UniProtKB/Swiss-Prot annotation:
Cofactor(s) demanded: Mn(2+); Mg(2+)
GO molecular function, one term: RNA-DNA hybrid ribonuclease activity
Protein name: Ribonuclease HIII
One of the GO BP terms on file: DNA replication, removal of RNA primer
EC number(s) stated in the UniProt entry for this protein: 3.1.26.4
Cellular component GO terms held in the UniProt record: cytoplasm; ribonuclease H2 complex
Catalysed transformations (reactions): Endonucleolytic cleavage to 5'-phosphomonoester
UniProt similarity note: Belongs to the RNase HII family. RnhC subfamily.
CDD domains linked: RNase_HII_bacteria_HIII_like, RNAse_HIII_N
Function in brief: Endonuclease that specifically degrades the RNA of RNA-DNA hybrids.
Broad class of where this protein is predominantly found: cytoplasm
Organism field: Lactococcus lactis subsp. lactis (strain IL1403) (Streptococcus lactis)
Highest taxon in the source lineage: Bacteria
């Protein structure tokens, strides 16, 4: 486990004093203090950042302001969110928030809800319409042109996702008319980073948000959101392929570069604004290929 804290000078001095008997030499020029407590290391950086790494990280960091994360124990009365499209050059970005109640638990298990990455696209296209029809949810679809506009306005790849997850949760809470017991986000950034960006947003959910890695494997609500988001992404990619006259691939590999280069040659570089996330490195690679 990794926990990162930003401590003041006095707090860093207190930490160094507390663990001076565990101090070891670090070859990293940016580390001012390094200690090994059992199997857990503590690294204090010149920037003021302190990294606790190991199985006792949470326990050691709790003495310096870290609040241990409480993982929800129930599957129901819970909102879960997930996004799809953030790693694909072509296509938009889809973020879904879904609410799972006790009455829908058996239904979800019967139709085989699982993380979308574990399901074939064919299975997703079978399941997703049933989920959309029955499960309370809010899905936000950001087309490439809108995505590029938002990025150009000052957002980055992380802050745009924070804004969308936050808004989807906020709108779903309003739709439900009551507070869920828990809200779980499939973690795509650190909790500190999430808080930094979400504090800049206008709307905020009433319920505390928990960020968990691999949450789609632990909570059905997150798995539902994963499936709906994946379905919407596939539909969006299909629509954009039809409009452009090119079969647009998912992902951000070499094939994306080659297809983008073909689009540039036939329609001009501006055509990519409607089809792809321009800040990806694929854009410049495609321009170079198109010039060959």
């Amino acid at each position: 486990m990794n926990i990162v804290l930003k401590l003041e000078t006095k707090e860093r001095q207190q930490l160094a004093e507390k663990y001076k008997s565990y101090e070891q030499v670090s070859k990293n020029p940016y580390i001012t203090f390094f200690a090994k407590v059992g199997k857990t290391s503590i690294s204090v950086y010149t920037s003021g950042k302190v990294v606790f790494q190991g199985n006792e990280a949470e326990k050691l960091a709790s003495d310096f302001g870290h609040i241990a994360q409480v993982v929800p124990q129930k599957q129901t009365n819970l909102i879960g969110t997930d996004e799809v499209g953030n790693g694909s050059y072509f296509g938009g970005l889809m973020v879904t928030a879904s609410f799972v109640s006790e009455e829908n638990l058996n239904f979800l298990k019967e139709i085989g809800v699982a993380d979308s990455k574990k399901l074939t696209d064919e299975k997703i296209c079978q399941i997703a319409p049933k989920l959309i029809d029955r499960i309370p949810h809010v899905a936000l679809v950001v087309e490439p042109a809108k995505y590029n506009e938002v990025i150009a306005s000052g957002y980055n790849a992380v802050s745009i996702k924070v804004a969308l997850h936050n808004q989807a949760i906020y709108l779903l809470e309003k739709q439900l008319g009551h507070k869920p017991e828990n809200i779980v986000i499939d973690a795509f950034t650190t909790e500190a980073n999430y808080k930094k960006y979400v504090n800049k947003e206008q709307n905020h959910p009433l319920t505390k948000v928990t960020l968990l890695t691999k949450a789609e494997d632990q909570f059905l609500a997150v798995a539902v959101s994963s499936i709906i988001s994946r379905y919407l992404f596939l539909e969006n990619l299909k629509k954009l392929s039809k409009e452009s006259g090119f079969t647009l691939p998912s992902g951000a590999g070499n094939l994306s570069d080659k297809i983008a280069a073909q689009i540039i040659k036939s329609q001009g570089v501006d055509a990519l604004n409607q089809l792809a996330k321009l800040h990806f490195a694929n854009t410049q690679k495609a321009i170079k290929i198109a010039q060959l």
